[in-house]
Amino acid sequence: TISENYIVIKPKIDTRYSIDKVSTHDRIEQSCLVKETLLSLVEEKEYGDAKHIIIEEGQFFPDLETFVLKAVEGDKKQVTVVGLDGDSNRKHFGQLHKLYPLCDSITKLKALCLQCKDGTEAIFSKRIIEGKQQTSIGSNEKYIAVCRPCFLNNK
């Protein structure tokens, strides 16, 4: 369970819905700390007081692996990382994949395919606008969740 002493962190690059809150696509919001790097948090009071650290959009933090190891193994914190394990080209995205062999557990959540709309689980993000860059912050105006057949049939 999440203790009362927790902090939520999101990357500074993510300004989609709010500058200082994390938000679901349905606009359910939670106050958070905003950082470019995670290690910059270590000297702050909020970090020292927190028992549980929740990292939103973990793929955007360049020091994710180092920070998580320090927090969990060095400082005995509980850490939850939320993020994408792959980009819209099905390539590793950030350092999330480096955490897999270190995790106590991994829960991979799936959406429903927004292309075939038949209840099939979606395991990929498909970019629906032009562009080749890996980092393009967006929501359903740029990406949709799709199943494997829809991803492969409509590249």
Regions found by a protein language model. Give the residues of each.
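Conserved P-loop
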Residues: 1-44, 87-98, 108-111, 121-124, ...
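Short, high-confidence coil segments that cap the C-terminus of an alpha-helix
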Residues: 3-4, 50, 76
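Conserved P-loop NTPase "ATPase switch" module shared by AAA+ and STAND
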Residues: 47-61
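Structural recognition of the conserved hydrophobic beta-strand(s) that form the central parallel beta-sheet
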Residues: 54, 76-85
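Conserved ATPase-coupling elements of RecA-like P-loop NTPase cores
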Residues: 57-68, 86-93
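Conserved catalytic/switch belt of AAA+ P-loop NTPases
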Residues: 69-76
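Short basic (Lys/Arg) and small-residue
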Residues: 103
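Proline-centered turn/helix-capping motifs that create local helix->coil transitions or kinks
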Residues: 114-118
